[in-house]
C-alpha cells in the first residue's frame, strides 16, 4: 500500500501495490543568490527586506547594493568563489546581511558565537577557512583561534548610513580563487552537523540547493511579498537562515531580525512589527505559549497568518495551546541541514494538519527504506530517506560517512518513521545517538571526552534524558578510578570550563558501573530508564531564607508546588529561557543583577543560595536581618509572595 504525491500540496492517489515515494519536482527560478537579490532589488526596490529594533529598515535595493559592494571587497582581501569564510557575529540583522553578502561571492560558514576557544580552533581548521569575519574590536576567542592557525581576520566596520550597512577591513592579499559573483553550483553555505562520533560532519550546500529549498518553503507556506517573518531563530543554523531569512526574501517579503529571543518580548514584537508568521523550535513555542497564557493576547492575533514549528517534535498539547492562544494554524514541519532545511510539512488550512505528524513531502522525494535500501509501503516502519534538488551532494572530506549515508541516489536521514494511509509522515525515533536538546543536535561522545579528561574519571557515558520543554536534555554517568574523589558539582565545574553551557550535562551521576547491552557494548539509548533510580534526588527542605527564596522562585517559574534544596533546576524542567526568568525575579527581590552563568554553575537552591549570599549588597543583609525578626509563619508567607 502506498501513495504518490503530486508536487507541493498536490493530491495523493492510492495504490495497493506501489511503495510509497512522495514526489516534488519544482525547482528554483534563480540560478544563485545574487540573482535573487538583484531581481528583488528590481521588483521591490525600496520595500523593506530586513528590519530590527533600533535600526532603519534595509530595503531590497540596499541589500543588493551591500552584497554587490561586499564581493569586490572580499576579492581585494584575497577571498573569492569557493573560499570558506567563517562568520562569528552576534545574532541580529548584521549577521543576516553578512551571510548573504559573503555567499554572493564566496562560501559563508556562520559559527555559534558561544563556542569556546577549542571549538573555534576545530571549526576553523576543519573548514580550512580562508578568513574569519568578526565585529570591529571583538575579543571573541575565535580571534585567538584564528591567530594560532594563521587565518586572516576581517573586521566588520559599521557604515555611516545605518548599522545594517558596513564595510570590511583587513589586509589585502592576492586572490587565488575566482573573482566575481557566485553561480548555481558554487557552494554558498557550509554548516557542521553533529554525528554520533565526536567529529562533526561538514555539510556544503550550493546555491542550487538553497534556492530549491527557498521555493519549496515558499510554496508550502504560500508566501507573498506582503508577508513578514519574525525571526527568533539563531542565524548559524539552517532553520533561521533558510526558513526565516531566505524563504521570506525569496517571496519578496521581509524578515524582522531579533537580537535575542525572549518570550516576554514576544507580545511587543507582535504589536510593533505585525508579522504574518514566525518559525521556531518547540522550546521557544512552549515559552511563548506560557507567556501568552499569563496575559491577554487577543488584540495581537490579527497580524499572524500562521505559526511554523521545526527542528524537533512539537508536543500536540503545545500545538493545540498555540492555536487557541493566537487563533491561527500551527504548521509542523521536518527539516535537517543536509536537505537545506525542509523535507516535509503539514499543509496550510483548509487541508488537513495532523498533530504528531511532520506532514507531507514538501520539497524532495521522501521514502521509507528497509535495511537493504528497498522502498517500503505505507504503514511499514523503516528509515526516512530523501532525494531532490535541495539535498547536499555529500559531506565534505568524509568518504566514510558518504558511503553509509548515500545509497542509490537516496540520502538516509538516520531517522525512523512511517507514512500513514494518507501520505503523512510520522517520525518515531532517531536511529542515531544524537541528543536533540530543543533542536540543538549534540554529539554525546564530545561530552564524554571532556569528562574523561578529568583526572579521576575512568569512564563517562553521556545520554539523553526526557525534558518537558526541550524534549531531551543531557545527563552523564561517570565511573571514578579506584581511590579517586569527585562529585557532581566538581565535574560540572570542570565541564563548564570546557564546554558551552548548552552542552554541559544537567545531571552527572556517579555509578560503580555503566549498564551494558547483551553484547557488552554501552547502549546510550535506554540509559535514562536503566539509571532512573540514580537520577532521582531525595527531597530535602531548604534550610535558610535564601534557599527558601530561591526554591520559591523556581516553583513560581516552573509551576511546581515544592522544590528541595538539592533539586537540579534543569532536571526539574528548567531551560535557558526559564533560567533567565528565575534570575530576573531573584535580582528584583534582592536588588542586584545576577549573571546568567550563575544558575548553570549553581543549578540547585543550595548552591545558588550560597552564591547569592556571597554576592549580596549590605542593604540586602539588612533586609535579611529584618526578615529573621518576623514570626516564622509571616516570614514564610512573605517569601512565598516574592
Predicted regions and their residues:
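Conserved AMP-binding/adenylate-forming core of the ANL superfamily
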Residues: 28-29, 38, 46-92, 96-100, ...
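Conserved pre-ATP/AMP-binding loop-to-beta segment of ANL
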Residues: 45-46, 160, 173-192, 198-199, ...
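Conserved AMP-binding/adenylation subdomain of ANL enzymes
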Residues: 103, 211-228, 238-276, 287, ...
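Conserved ATP/PPi-binding loop(s) of AMP-dependent carboxylate-activating enzymes
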Residues: 360-363, 374-405, 424, 442, ...
Amino acid at each position: 500500500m502506498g501513495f504518490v504525491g503530486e508536487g507541493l500540496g498536490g493530491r495523493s492517489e492510492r495504490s495497493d501495490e506501489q511503495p510509497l515515494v512522495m514526489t516534488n519536482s519544482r525547482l528554483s527560478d534563480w540560478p544563485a543568490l545574487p540573482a535573487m537579490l538583484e531581481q528583488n532589488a528590481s521588483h521591490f526596490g525600496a520595500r523593506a527586506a530586513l528590519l530590527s529594533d533600533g535600526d532603519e529598515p534595509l530595503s531590497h535595493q540596499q541589500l543588493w547594493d551591500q552584497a554587490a559592494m561586499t564581493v569586490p571587497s572580499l576579492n581585494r582581501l584575497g577571498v573569492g568563489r569557493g573560499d570558506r569564510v567563517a562568520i562569528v557575529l552576534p545574532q541580529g540583522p548584521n549577521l543576516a546581511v553578512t551571510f548573504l553578502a559573503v555567499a554572493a561571492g564566496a562560501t559563508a560558514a556562520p559559527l555559534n558565537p558561544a563556542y569556546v576557544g577549542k571549538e573555534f580552533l576545530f571549526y576553523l581548521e576543519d573548514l580550512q577557512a580562508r578568513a574569519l569575519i568578526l565585529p570591529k574590536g571583538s575579543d571573541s576567542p575565535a580571534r585567538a583561534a584564528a591567530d594560532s592557525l594563521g587565518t586572516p581576520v576581517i573586521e566588520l566596520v559599521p557604515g555611516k548610513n545605518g548599522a545594517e550597512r558596513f564595510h570590511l577591513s583587513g589586509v589585502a592579499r592576492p586572490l587565488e580563487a575566482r573573482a566575481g559573483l557566485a553561480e548555481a553550483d558554487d557552494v554558498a553555505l557550509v554548516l557542521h552537523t553533529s554525528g554520533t562520533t565526536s567529529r562533526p560532519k561538514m555539510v556544503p550546500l550550493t546555491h542550487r540547493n538553497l534556492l530549491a529549498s527557498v521555493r519549496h518553503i515558499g510554496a508550502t507556506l504560500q508566501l507573498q511579498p506582503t508577508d513578514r517573518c519574525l525571526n527568533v531563530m539563531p542565524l548559524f543554523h539552517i532553520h533561521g537562515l533558510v526558513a526565516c531569512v531566505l524563504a521570506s526574501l525569496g517571496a519578496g517579503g521581509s524578515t524582522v531580525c531579533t537580537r535575542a529571543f525572549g518570550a516576554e518580548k514576544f507580545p511587543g514584537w507582535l504589536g510593533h512589527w505585525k508579522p504574518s508568521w514566525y518559525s521556531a523550535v518547540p522550546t521557544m513555542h512552549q515559552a511563548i505559549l506560557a507567556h501568552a497564557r499569563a496575559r491577554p493576547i487577543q488584540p495581537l492575533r490579527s497580524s499572524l497568518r500562521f505559526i511554523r514549528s521545526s527542528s524537533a517534535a512539537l508536543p500536540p498539547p503545545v500545538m493545540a495551546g498555540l492555536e487557541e492562544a493566537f487563533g491561527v494554524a500551527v504548521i509542523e514541519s521536518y527539516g535537517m541541514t543536509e536537505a537545506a532545511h525542509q523535507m516535509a510539512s503539514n499543509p496550510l488550512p483548509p487541508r488537513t494538519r495532523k498533530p504528531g505528524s511532520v506532514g507531507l513531502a514538501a520539497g524532495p522525494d521522501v521514502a521509507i527504506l528497509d535495511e537493504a535500501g528497498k522502498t517500503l509501503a505505507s504503514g511499514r516502519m523503516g528509515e526516512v530517506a530523501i532525494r531532490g534538488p535541495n539535498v547536499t551532494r555529500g559531506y565534505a572530506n568524509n568518504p566514510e560517512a558518504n558511503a553509509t549515508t548515500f545509497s542509490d541516489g537516496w540520502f538516509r536521514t538516520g531517522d525512523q518513521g512511517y507514512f500513514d494511509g494518507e501520505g503523512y509522515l510520522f517520525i518515531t525515533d532517531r536511529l542515531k545517538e544524537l541528543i536533540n536538546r530543543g533542536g540543538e543536535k549534540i554529539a554525546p561522545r564530545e561530552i564524554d571526552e571532556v569528562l574523561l579528561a578529568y583526572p579521576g574519571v575512568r569512564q563517562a557515558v553521556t545520554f539523553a534524558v526526557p525534558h518537558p520543554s526541550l524534549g531531551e536534555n543531557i545527563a552523564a554517568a561517570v565511573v571514578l578510578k579506584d581511590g579517586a574523589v569527585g562529585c557532581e558539582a566538581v565535574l560540572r565545574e570542570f565541564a563548564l570550563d570546557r564546554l558551552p553551557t548548552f552542552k554541559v550535562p544537567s545531571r552527572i551521576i556517579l555509578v560503580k558501573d555503566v549498564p551494558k547491552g547483551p553484547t557488552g557494548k554501552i547502549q546510550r539509548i535506554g540509559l535514562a530508564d536503566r539509571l532512573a533510580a540514580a537520577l532521582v534526588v531525595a527531597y530535602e527542605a531548604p534550610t535558610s531564607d535564601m534557599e527558601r527564596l530561591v526554591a520559591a522562585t523556581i516553583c513560581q517559574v516552573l509551576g511546581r508546588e515544592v522544590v528541595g534544596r538539592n533539586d537540579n533546576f534543569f532536571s526539574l524542567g528548567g531551560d535557558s529561557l526559564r533560567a533567565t526568568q528565575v534570575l530576573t525575579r531573584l535580582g528584583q527581590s534582592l536588588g542586584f543583577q545576577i549573571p546568567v552563568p550563575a544558575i548553570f554553575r549553581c543549578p540547585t537552591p543550595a548552591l545558588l543560595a550560597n552564591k547569592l549570599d556571597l554576592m549580596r549588597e549590605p542593604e540586602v543583609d539588612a533586609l535579611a536581618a529584618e526578615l529573621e525578626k518576623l514570626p516564622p509563619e509571616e516570614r514564610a508567607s512573605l517569601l512565598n509572595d516574592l
